Swiss-Prot record:
It comes from Synechococcus sp. (strain WH7803). Binds 2 [4Fe-4S] clusters. Binds 1 [4Fe-4S] cluster coordinated with 3 cysteines and an exchangeable S-adenosyl-L-methionine and 1 [4Fe-4S] cluster coordinated with 3 cysteines and the GTP-derived substrate. Residues 12-242 form the Radical SAM core domain. This is GTP 3',8-cyclase. InterPro entries: Aldolase_TIM, MoaA, MoaA_twitch, MoCo_biosynth_MoaA/MoaC, rSAM. Monomer and homodimer. Catalyzes the cyclization of GTP to (8S)-3',8-cyclo-7,8-dihydroguanosine 5'-triphosphate. The gene is moaA.
Amino acid sequence: MSPAPPPVDQWFRPFGVLRLSLTARCNLACPYCCPDSEELPGLMRLDQQVRLVRVACGLGVHTLRLTGGEPLLSDRLLPLLEALAAGRSNAADPLARLQEVALTTNGVLLTPEKALALRAAGLDRITVSLDALEGGVVATMAGLRGGQRAGERLVEQVLGGLSAARRAGFEPASGGLKLNAVMRRGLNDSQLLPLATLARERGVELRLIEYMDVGNRNGWAPDQVISAAEMVQRIDARWPLRPLPRESGATSRRWSYADGRGRIGTIASITEPFCGDCNRLRVTADGQAFTCLFASEGTDLRPFLHSEETLEAVVRGLWQQRRDRYSEERQGFTASAPHAEMAYLGG
């Protein structure tokens, strides 16, 4: 029997991507994310996480993104990957429909041993976040004490993590290793070309993210946003770019360098919203499901995690009722509208 078609929401968007946060804790304190220092109570157990992913795959999910906080802080990461790999190898298991399991990390804990373990456990892709290369700017963007020296140490760790991931088999050429950077005017906009230079030298796709109004702690203001168009224009003036087709459901628009030295992408939730084909559901480490990054509250899945049948009915119904289009409707919301925090949602 063929699987039932994926549910569609009120705007006819299918369910395709599950973003699962493993922890809200982080070893950095980036001001745009504002992570918590203590673990959430009531975290999902490993068996519940696997059950959730299996149900999501039965509803059409083809991509799983593991997030945080900092997911490498979670002692459940490797056991989860191993359990998912076992399911993916069984054609009769809905987990076999997973085409990609990806991880987003700040790279600080991405040692050679950890990178090899992640690859062996079945992880397909790693995205490393790095917002600057100059020590003082890095310290500001990562919320570090110790100024320039602390920032320089962090850059060394993250670049070491990138190298470790590549040696472990996460290949940039096939999309297995990418670099993320959140750009904020007046803080790290001077780092745009240095980051692009680094990515070109290492053959890694650089994804440039507009500073977003997620959460209530980061003091977001529109004049702090560097638009994707401006970022592309500045890079194109240095190294000519060629636009690439946008894939359905993708968060990013992409360009290739005319000289063949790699690609960049932009995630422009502020200036070029992509709500129209958004196919993502976010579930926090404590089992709250959010149908939009900018939502103020979620749906508690924990009462339903004991049964795949019950959980499937709840998640299907949640998706079918979904109407979120916050980024497209942003101007109609008041400045005081509450949002869940980025570190809690997992980006």
